[in-house]
């Protein structure tokens, strides 16, 4: 112990966090939370989009539908689900054999981080006919 002015006993080493350390920790927590709030909804939305696309692909392959019918069904389902994208813009048909159709889902989603800084999520998945066979609604 160090004897301070006015006869107080002061510790010779600081214990605990300083004000600067606490402020830095709060800023880091806020930045991590903000990044999480920008990324997590995009990931959840992509999961739902991929799941609905796989189920529509399963139905289309079971009914041996054409690419045009498949994309029409996907657009109808996405409209019901409130998806703003059009299937023609984000879905590419890899194999268009009726009953064995495979597709590639590819798109970007940008979320504002702050000011003019955006977080861009790029998604690219291929759903084969085999993958679609096990799809559930």
Task: Walk through the language-model features, giving the residues of each.
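Low-complexity, S/T/G/P-rich flexible repeat/linker segments used as non-globular hinges
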Residues: 112-137
């Amino acid at each position: 112990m160090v004897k301070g002015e006015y006869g107080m006993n002061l510790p010779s080493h600081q214990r605990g966090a300083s004000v600067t350390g606490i402020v830095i920790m709060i800023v880091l927590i806020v930045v991590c939370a903000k990044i999480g709030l920008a990324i997590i909804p995009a990931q959840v939305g992509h999961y739902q989009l991929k799941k609905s696309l796989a189920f529509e692909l399963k139905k289309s392959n079971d009914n041996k539908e054409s690419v045009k019918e498949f994309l029409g069904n996907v657009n109808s389902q996405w409209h019901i689900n409130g998806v703003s994208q059009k299937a023609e813009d984000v879905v590419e048909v890899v194999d268009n054999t009726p009953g064995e159709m495979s597709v590639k889902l590819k798109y970007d989603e940008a979320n504002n981080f702050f000011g003019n800084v955006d977080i861009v999520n790029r998604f690219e998945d291929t759903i084969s006919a085999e993958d679609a066979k096990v799809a559930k609604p």
